[in-house]
Amino acid sequence: MTCKIIGCGGYLPSKIVSNDELAKFVETNDEWIRTRSGISQRHIADDNEYTSHLALKSAEQAIADARVSANDVDLIITCTTTSDNSFPSVATKLHGYLGLTNIPSFDLQAVCAGFVYGLQVADSLIASGKYKTILLIGAEKMTSLLDWNDRSTCVLFGDGAGSVILQRSSDDSGLIDSNIFSSGADYEILYTSGGISMNGTSGKIIMQGQKLFRHAIEKMQQSIEDLLHTNQFSVSGIDYFIPHQANIRIINKLAELLNIEEHKVVKTVEKHANCSAASIPLALSTLKASGKIKKGDILLFSAIGAGLTWGSALIRW
């Protein structure tokens, strides 16, 4: 018994900031950003537009795409590291926005790997038989964590949300398998300078870029190869590779090492920047909207985030 995706949705704030616009108040330029990240623009939420608002927009799209009612949802999981409030959770606020009754809702925090983590958790809960229809969301307002004087980080992130509706599969479609990992020893590679119990602030993003690049390649490659081997899949059997959209150099290097053909690699980082837990569901929503995915296609997700946390998932559409 496994879960399958029956609907997708994605939302990006209307405000777009290009590299050239960013260079007006950050010591950088378009060539420098593109060369190092592949990013040309990012979407930035307004001050009064919160993570829960982004989540709601994407959730409404996913519900419509799945052709179900919001009242059919019996569990909400929101993957985010940028909650509106310390409490309650974004998922619970979304529960209220959707006007739902007493179904459970909670947030899951695994940063950029959040959606892959959430997918495994949701699959386990559906397999338990307790839940039939789960709304799984990746939503982030990453720009709220940026130090706009640090050009090594502030140019890399954007805001957005992506959602999927999951139900139990009655055929061979759905989640084939997934794996998730963490390494707390690598905490200082990517973290924020603050937190509620530390200093009562959200802090700003601090990143050791070169170390993170090496770990991303090594850990995502190993995760993918282990997943394919365990499930007796070959790389040639993958129809679409949807990696976390952090950096075009990481995406391209992974595809090269894994020998995944260029036309199979989904890339949205140029226009979306790094939307953390939202990046994979946003990319999936973009791919589905293009009409390219067909029934039976094999999709491969993989992500790495702060913690470090990482993992991969195989899905038959």
Curated annotation (Swiss-Prot):
Pathways involved: Lipid metabolism; fatty acid biosynthesis
Recorded catalytic activity of this chain's protein: malonyl-[ACP] + acetyl-CoA + H(+) = 3-oxobutanoyl-[ACP] + CO2 + CoA
Gene Ontology cellular component terms for the protein in this record: cytoplasm
Compartments reported by the entry: Cytoplasm
CDD domains per UniProt: KAS_III (cd00830)
Gene Ontology molecular function: any one: beta-ketoacyl-acyl-carrier-protein synthase III activity
Top-rank EC class of the record's enzyme: transferase
Transmembrane segments: none
Keyword GTP-binding set for record: no
Function per UniProt: Catalyzes the condensation reaction of fatty acid synthesis by the addition to an acyl acceptor of two carbons from malonyl-ACP. Catalyzes the first condensation reaction which initiates fatty acid synthesis and may therefore play a role in governing the total rate of fatty acid production. Possesses both acetoacetyl-ACP synthase and acetyl transacylase activities. Its substrate specificity determines the biosynthesis of branched-chain and/or straight-chain of fatty acids.
Recorded family membership: Belongs to the thiolase-like superfamily. FabH family.
Domain notes: The last Arg residue of the ACP-binding site is essential for the weak association between ACP/AcpP and FabH.
Subunit architecture: Homodimer.
The name this protein goes by in its record: Beta-ketoacyl-[acyl-carrier-protein] synthase III
Gene (UniProt): fabH
